[in-house]
Regions:
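Asp-based, Mg2+/Mn2+-dependent phosphohydrolase catalytic module
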Residues: 1-3, 95-98, 112, 116-218
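Conserved SAM-binding loop
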Residues: 13, 104, 163-164
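Conserved donor sugar-nucleotide recognition element shared by glycan-biosynthetic enzymes
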Residues: 20, 48, 86, 143
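Short, acidic loop-to-helix structural element flanking the phosphoryl-transfer center
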Residues: 78-106, 116, 144
């Protein structure tokens, strides 16, 4: 039986991946600049600093990289504070874990202020012992550190722990550590679905299948 759950947020608990594809485009629109159609794809594969530099050079924006980063982050923060919705019936697995005394933590690449305002609005904070972010931990989810820290808080061993994720590279890290995985489909990672399926102990196309997950973790 599962003794601890680790949750990704974007594309897993929240239906929020789209803002990361659109934020730079919306920011440029506010500056009166029309962005290229595939800007979201370009930005998705860059760090914030790299993305800001790309925007400054490509669109001849007369602002510092920090000012551009801050502007894009304001767009993203506003989305989390006002709009970011739950992803389908994700609340069902949180309720199940709480009722069965299974501790939960978050492991996310999104910075904590954005997660915190979304969780406050949606009343999700009560479910989690701690929120771990890659920024605060100092390494990405392609490294084991964030999952090791999560398990320390949960008090679990890898084979007692389940990770809920839509991202293939995070699942790959967890699987190599011996952590069980639930793969959740998200349209933002269409191209990675074969890998997500191959890494998942349980794969679901939507949270309508939450009972399938509950059966697996019992």
């Amino acid at each position: 039986m599962a003794k601890g759950f680790i949750f990704d947020v974007d594309g897993t608990i929240l239906d929020s991946m789209e803002i990361w594809m659109d934020a730079a485009k919306l920011y440029l629109k506010d500056l009166g600049i029309e962005a290229e159609e595939n800007l979201g794809d370009i930005m998705f594969n860059l760090t914030m600093a790299e993305g800001a530099e790309y925007i400054r050079k490509t669109y001849k924006v007369n602002l510092s990289d920090k000012e551009i980063c801050d502007g894009i982050n304001q767009k993203v923060f506003g989305f989390y504070k006002e709009e970011a919705p739950l992803k389908g019936k994700s609340i069902e697995i949180l309720e199940y874990a709480q009722k069965n005394n299974i501790p939960m933590v978050v492991a996310t690449s999104t910075d904590s202020p954005m997660i915190e305002v979304a969780f406050e609005r949606l009343n999700l904070g009560k479910y989690f012992k701690k929120i771990y972010t890659t920024t605060e931990v100092g390494s990405g989810k392609d490294k084991p550190e964030i999952f090791m820290r999560a398990m320390e808080t949960l008090g679990t061993k890898p084979d007692e722990t389940w990770l809920f994720e839509d991202g293939a590279y995070s699942m790959d890290t967890a699987k190599k550590m011996g952590i069980h995985t639930v793969g959740i489909y998200d349209k933002s990672s269409d191209k990675d679905q074969d890998m997500v399926k191959s890494l998942a102990d349980v794969y679901i196309t939507s949270w309508d299948e939450y009972e399938k997950v509950i059966k697996a973790v019992k």
